[in-house]
Design a protein with these regions (language model features):
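Alpha-amylase-like alpha-glycosidases and glucanotransferases acting on alpha-linked glucans and related
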Residues: 2-26, 30-36, 68-74, 79-106, ...
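Catalytic domains of carbohydrate-active enzymes, especially glycoside hydrolases
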Residues: 42-65, 341-353
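C-terminal RecA-like lobe
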Residues: 546, 831-874
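Flexible loop residues that form catalytic
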Residues: 62, 359, 425, 825
Length: 926
């Protein structure tokens, strides 16, 4: 008789099964899913992608998102596919088609936040109904004990267009009934009322009905019985498990009973609906809203003017977006609920790899990536069937297995069974933590380095002078970024800064050594150190094993902050330094030590949004010297990439992260690769650029408006506009059509609001925005300007095409997995989202690929023809098709190949970069 299989053996078998089908993509193709591009649309694309040489389809988020979502990053239900994308049958048909062609499916996963303020998010609705006693209260990162007393045990909902009292008395907040449940509505938004507050409404109805129906009426008796049940519910502040279970059970029974009563008793229904109508008040009679005000004040949430969010919001958000609430996947039950369906897809082989969105928002990214891999193993074991025993024992066995593998392995490919890449933005010298259980980043580090190769670094001083002279100011990138961080922390993310400051102040009260530090002082040093941190975040999770990387960046931030603030006590900076590095744990009681670690983890979740909002979404729209460099993950203050630095990055990638993704355009980039390739040309023609600026400024001076006695747009925004126009002007166009005009207006309005100099999304200046819109239109309508502009544009466009083809070839040949963003296999002159989500003409791309196949025997002739007509984009598709075919024919060169920089000699040496790759007796030179 065979002995039973041990849990350890089952783990080993599951890992072996996953490893056997582990896919490292050969090349990925990113598709943006929405109601206009569904699973069926993607299925129709598969033969084209396969013919092009794509190995893995890469999908944007596919789980159920908020109604109307155009991007899918506002998931409201992780247990369902997004119905606007199609059915399960549609998705399975897509997965089957990929499998038939030996293609994989890489899925974009959003574990940091969910879309809320919509009834499609049942977890959030339950929190609004039940407050801290909701089973999902710990799913979201809510501070139920904020400093403001009125918000204790309540969540702030900053959704109102005006002050609460104004909105209330305008009659825009209305109670409605659905069956036996009550809600408050505000336009399309609908929030549940807590059952604790139902008696307020039902008691008066019962009293009124007694006179009409008589005390002995059975329906009135049932209503009073329901009232008693509701009054005996555990309050929403009672968080004991048994009370939560009782409340969840009994409130639903009470609502069902009320719904049944209303169906059989027209008098009760009529009386209740009349009471609701009275409760909703009459505009013009402020006192008529008093009862509704009392009812709303009894809810586990507080409706508020949207501007209140910056100062008082008490749930963690994705950046400053109120409609995206952070979730706590560090809690095992939350992780399982969020990833359950995803892991079933992985175990079944429907999904073969993952892209993780915004990992820097997570409590402990390193632990999360490890948990992803372990969860894939557990899901595989469950799918294999049989008795898996105790879940905790299984989890422990999986962890022990990987611990042993880590201790004995030399190659990470031998350890982790699931291909995972992370949307991690690295600074120029910042390494990706080597312990993370993944294959690398999504490629912004490559984008930055490769993009910079096409900028002439020797022209930096000249270009800086041109920029400074034109805008009549000398801007310092680091100073702008620092000030932008301070600004963001005093506006959009003020409430987050206040929350972690309060957290630390409460900790200091537990130590006689530190209790004299004031809240104001602590908030000040947290703000200054955060503003001085040169990276998105650190990854400290325990006093043991703090990396040299994290220690270096914390110490550097503290030193820089102290230097900038000589008037602030050094004791405060020293305390914060020791706290962030967990050096002072022994000076606190054990319970306080846990809170101190929690503060450090919260601070690390805070610094990433500060960096993103202040640098990517503010400074990048202010410092416009050469906006080809103003890209996600890039460093505009560094004018180009020296070839040695590019080679070093590739050497490090082939050694540490050989399967990391390589990106040149994404759904998040500020400009497409082709736009950046054009704008980079300006660095090689500074004299011509300066002369053009002078002519265009003179031609267009009269087209500006006047705002606050100053010309609008200002010269910095004008400088940005000319670069943008050169970047996006359609190939072969002799005038701007309405589509281009609308795109440029939309972009410039977004740019000036993101810059936050003259206008912003929070405080819009309509006069300035109207001046910008008018300027764009008048410039494009001016035949004299267009006539002067076109020769410069054509020259820039020609060399931009050369740049883009070279960049494309680099992406397809250096170490890593090349990713192609939808449509960029031919020229695509797109700007920031939503401009980069415009429809792609796949019929045109298929026709060009068919032409290449049809004339395959004359590749040299094709190359000459396409190069001679490069403006039509066929040359780019030809380069991609040729390079991907070469990759497929020589997989070892790209999976295991070495990377060796080559010295370039000759007159054009400074314009060339070369390298060799070797593996298994094969070699190639680029």
């Amino acid at each position: 008789m065979d002995s039973p299989v041990t849990v350890e053996e089952r783990v080993a078998q599951a890992v072996e099964a996953l490893q056997a089908r582990r896919r490292v993509p050969h090349a990925t193709y990113r598709v943006q899913m929405n109601e206009n591009f569904t699973f069926r649309d993607t299925l129709a694309l598969v033969p084209y992608l396969d013919a092009l040489g794509i190995s893995d389809l890469y999908l944007s988020p596919i789980f159920k998102a908020r109604p109307g979502s155009t991007h899918g990053y506002d998931v409201c239900d992780y247990s369902e596919l997004n119905p606007v994308l199609g059915t399960w049958e549609d998705f399975r048909a897509l997965a089957a088609a990929l499998r038939e062609r030996d293609m994989g499916l890489l899925l974009d996963m959003v574990p940091n936040h969910m879309g809320i303020m919509s009834e499609c998010n049942g977890w959030w609705m339950d929190v609004l109904e039940n407050g801290p006693s909701s089973p999902y209260a710990s799913t979201f990162d809510i501070d139920w004990r904020p400093v403001k007393r009125e918000l204790q045990n309540r969540v702030l909902l900053p959704i109102l267009e005006d002050q609460y009292g104004v909105v209330l008395e305008d009659g825009k907040l209305r109670v409605v009934r659905e069956g036996g449940a009550f809600f408050v509505t505000y336009y399309a938004a609908r929030m549940p009322l807590t059952p604790d507050s139902y008696p307020t409404l039902l008691a008066s109805v019962a009293d009124d009905l007694e006179a009409a129906l008589g005390e002995g009426d059975e329906h009135l008796a049932e209503l009073r019985s329901i009232l008693t049940a509701l009054r005996n519910l555990p309050p929403y502040t009672d968080t004991r498990p048994e009370s939560i279970a009782e409340r969840q059970r009994e409130k639903e029974i009470a609502k069902q009973r009320l719904a049944s009563l209303l169906e059989v008793s027209p008098p009760v229904q009529e009386a209740l609906d009349a009471a609701i109508a009275t409760l909703n008040g009459t505009p013009g009679q402020p006192e008529s809203f008093d009862a509704l005000d009392r009812l709303l004040s009894a809810q586990p949430y507080r409706l508020a003017f949207w501007r209140v969010a910056a100062d008082e919001i008490n749930y963690r958000r994705f950046f400053e977006v109120n409609e995206l609430a952070a979730i706590r996947v560090e809690q095992p039950e939350v992780f399982d609920a969020v990833h359950g369906l995803l892991m079933e897809m992985v175990a079944e082989g429907l999904v073969t790899g993952l892209r993780i969105d915004h990992p820097d928002g997570l409590w402990d990214p390193g632990a999360y990536f490890r948990q992803l891999q372990e969860s894939a193993v557990a899901a595989t074991i469950r799918r294999q069937g049989g008795d898996i025993g105790d879940e905790r024992e299984l989890a422990a066995a999986i962890r022990a297995y990987f611990d042993a593998q880590i201790a004995g392995a030399e190659d990470r490919d031998d350890i982790w069974p699931l291909y995972v890449v992370a949307e991690k933005i690295l600074s120029e010298t910042e390494p990706l933590p080597a312990s993370w259980a993944l294959d690398g980043t999504t490629g912004y580090d490559f984008l930055s380095a490769a993009n910079g190769l096409f900028v002439d670094g020797s022209a930096e001083e000249r270009f800086t002078e041109i920029y400074s002279r034109f805008i009549r100011a000398r801007l310092d990138f680091d100073r702008i970024a620092y000030n932008a961080k301070l600004f963001i922390m005093s506006t959009a993310l003020s409430s987050e800064l206040q929350a972690i400051s309060n957290q630390l102040e409460r900790i200091t009260e537990d130590s006689r050594r530190y209790r004299d530090f004031t809240l104001s002082g602590l908030r000040s040093v947290i703000r200054e150190v955060t503003a001085s941190l040169p990276i998105y975040r650190t990854y400290i999770s325990s006093p043991d094993g703090i990396s040299e990387r994290d220690q270096y960046f914390v110490l550097r931030a503290v030193v820089d902050a102290r230097r900038r603030n000589p008037g602030t006590s050094r004791l405060l900076f020293s305390f914060l330094r020791d706290t962030l590095l967990l050096r002072n744990l022994d000076q606190f009681r054990p319970a306080t030590r846990r809170r101190l670690l929690s503060f450090v983890m919260s601070w690390q979740q805070f610094t990433g949004p500060v960096m993103a909002k202040s640098v990517e979404d503010t400074t990048f729209y202010v410092y416009n010297r050469l906006v080809a460099l103003n890209e996600v993950g890039s460093h505009p203050e560094q004018f180009g990439t020296p070839p040695d630095a590019f080679h070093e990055q590739n050497r490090m990638r082939v050694e540490h992260w050989p399967h990391a993704m390589l990106a040149t355009s994404t759904h998040d980039t500020k400009r497409s690769e082709d736009v950046r390739a054009r704008i980079a040309v300006l660095s090689e023609m500074p004299d011509e650029w300066e002369a053009a600026l002078e002519r265009w400024a003179a031609l267009n001076a009269s087209k500006k408006g006047t705002v606050d006695d100053e010309p609008a747009p200002d010269r910095n925004d004008e400088y940005l506009f000319y670069q943008t126009l050169l970047g996006v002007w359609p190939e072969g166009a002799t005038a701007a059509d309405e589509t281009l005009r609308a795109r440029l207006v939309d972009y410039m309005l977004k740019a000036v609001n993101e810059a936050k100099v003259h206008t912003s999304w929070i405080n819009p200046d309509d006069a300035y925005m109207q001046a910008v819109e008018g300027f764009v239109g008048r410039v494009l309508d001016d035949a004299a300007f267009v006539e002067d502009f076109l020769p410069v544009q054509r020259r820039v466009a020609f060399f931009g095409r050369v740049n883009s083809l070279a960049l494309t070839l680099l992406k397809l040949t250096v170490p890593g997995v090349p990713d192609i963003y939808r449509g960029t296999e031919m020229w695509q002159f797109s700007l920031v989202d939503p401009d980069n989500r415009r429809p792609v003409d796949y019929a045109r791309r298929q026709a060009v690929l068919d032409e290449i196949r049809r004339r395959g025997d004359d590749r040299a002739g094709l190359a000459r023809e396409f190069a001679g007509h490069s403006a039509d984009g066929r040359a780019k598709l030809y380069v991609i098709d040729t390079a991907l075919a070469f990759r497929k024919a020589h997989p070892a060169l790209f999976r295991q190949g070495s990377y060796e920089p080559l010295a370039v000699r000759g007159e054009a040496a400074e314009h060339a970069v070369g390298f060799a790759r070797r593996a298994n007796g094969e070699e190639m030179i680029v």
